[in-house]
Regions:
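A short acidic, Gly/Pro-enriched loop at the edge of an enzyme's catalytic core
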Residues: 94-101
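A conserved beta-strand element that flanks and buttresses the S-adenosyl-L-methionine
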Residues: 103-105
Length: 232
């Protein structure tokens, strides 16, 4: 059972304010063509706009509940034919196809707890790519300001939806809790410094094309967010 299953119906209203990455991932999908593989597809926050732009999406997620919401949203939008949704793990995606683009949006790789798991996931993504194909993902590491503002406090993130962040700077973990009425879940995220992601990509056989500091493609120059583009 995924930690997202209890909050599958809560996820969209919880993340409703997260829109800054959608056009970026849709543009990259259009540049690569159908199909694209999206790892951690969730409820289709990015996959459905991608499908609406005319791109077929093979979406993998470890939460059956999130995939059910994604399928429902796809049907409601008349896009079910463009969505191929599969239950599976980031480290062992159930995909035999070879594609030009694999994405892992919205920090999904931070669910991986060790370098061993990260390398397994990166190698799996590389295995889905045709020669020259690209992996695009985004991750973050917190600023001290982030930690100071949020640590150990319940904060109303959206109307009726509370979120709590418990940061452990020594272990580089974020224990994130979300709740609405009787729906609640807690998950752990493990962050890394950008230099470490760069080294892991190289170890997994990728060549890094770009590391951006935001979805406007500004080159990374320090800060919390990194957006990585690497090719096989």
């Amino acid at each position: 059972v995924s930690s997202y299953d209890p909050i599958a119906r809560l996820y969209d209203p919880w993340s409703t304010g997260v829109i800054e990455d959608i056009s970026f991932y849709v543009e990259e999908a259009l540049a690569s063509g159908s199909p694209v593989v999206e790892l951690g597809v969730g409820t289709g926050r990015i996959a459905i706009p991608t499908a609406a732009a005319g791109i077929d999406v093979i979406g993998v997620d470890s939460s059956a509940g999130m995939l059910a919401v994604c399928a429902e949203r796809g049907r409601d939008a008349g896009l079910a034919a463009r969505l191929d949704l599969r239950l599976g793990d980031l480290r062992r995606p159930p995909v035999d196809e070879r594609v030009e683009l694999v994405t892992c949006p919205f920090r999904a790789y931070l669910h991986l707890a060790s370098d061993e798991e990260r390398l397994e996931a990166l190698a799996a993504a590389r295995g889905l790519l045709r020669p020259g194909g690209r992996l695009i993902f985004d991750v973050f590491r917190p600023s001290q300001e982030d930690v100071d503002e949020t640590n150990g406090r319940w904060i109303e993130r959206e109307p009726g939806i509370d979120e709590r962040a418990d940061w452990d700077l020594d272990r580089q973990t974020l224990t994130l809790s979300v709740r609405r009425a009787d729906e609640q879940s807690t998950m752990t995220l493990w962050w890394l410094e950008p230099e470490r992601w760069n080294a892991l990509l190289a170890e997994a056989g990728f060549e890094v094309d770009a590391c951006y500091g935001w979805f406007d493609r500004t080159p990374y120059a320090g800060g919390e967010d990194t957006v990585w583009i690497a090719h096989r």
